[in-house]
Regions:
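Flexible, processing/modification-adjacent segments and terminal tails
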Residues: 36-121
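Gly/Pro-enriched, hydrophobic low-complexity segments
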Residues: 82-217, 222-226
């Protein structure tokens, strides 16, 4: 199970095929926690890219991962006059963004199939590819595919009817989301693939969704790693 909310809040619950919880990662954008129930260790520390990679395996910043999981391109900080966009013969726009920190981002975009005949300012775009390089080295590369619309989540009901329902966390939305996302980080040769079989927009978010307490009997380890 996965929850991702802008700008950098994320929760991942790893469950075995038999329904047994194996690990839970939470990050509110500032603090990170990973409860590894297999070895009864609770890791906690700053929400750095390398800490989040303890579960995802790919060291990318939290806001980058959240954007990609939502089917969006995390845009580098840049000057207003810097970006350029050209049409590629393979059937997509190539948006190139030079950042203020000597990095370059390349984003591949294309309209939804049903929007090709619409005026350009009414076309809804799909993000297919994101690549960020710095001084000639690839920092990360993401491929997004199998785009389809997703519904808005309904309220979360208390099965015992003791508490009022928790409403969706946002307005009605049916935007598309890529069902397959592949993220690669050449150094240290890491990659991860996400496959959505069921998803919805703006699910109810109970208090504490992006944080977790230490469970009794777990060994606590404070972790700090180099970015």
């Amino acid at each position: 199970m996965l929850f991702a909310a802008r700008p950098a809040r994320i929760r991942m619950d790893v469950v075995s095929p038999f329904g047994v919880a194996l690990a839970t990662l939470t990050s509110d954008g500032r603090q990170f926690a990973l409860a590894d129930l297999r070895d009864r260790t609770f890791y906690e520390g700053p929400a750095s890219a390398c800490n989040i990679a303890r579960l995802t395996t790919v060291p990318v910043p939290g806001h980058v991962l959240v954007a990609l999981l939502r089917g969006e391109a995390p845009v580098l900080r840049h000057e207003a006059v810097g970006p350029t966009m050209v049409w590629d013969k393979h059937g997509w726009w190539v948006l190139t963004i030079p950042s203020t920190r000597q990095a370059v981002e390349e984003i591949h975009l294309a309209p939804r199939p049903q929007d090709w005949q619409r005026p350009w300012d009414q076309q809804r775009m799909r993000v297919y590819d994101v690549r960020v390089t710095q001084q000639g080295y690839v920092l990360y590369h993401a491929e997004l595919s199998d785009h389809a619309g997703a519904p808005t989540a309904g309220p979360r009901e208390d099965p015992d009817n003791l508490e009022p329902p928790i409403p969706p966390s946002g307005p009605t939305c049916d935007a598309e989301v890529p069902r397959r996302i592949h993220v690669e980080v050449p150094v240290p040769e890491a990659d991860v693939r996400f496959l959505y079989t069921q998803l919805s927009w703006n699910p109810p978010l109970p208090e504490g969704t992006f944080a977790q307490p230490v469970q009794p009997g777990m060994r606590v380890e404070h972790v700090i790693c180099e970015e």
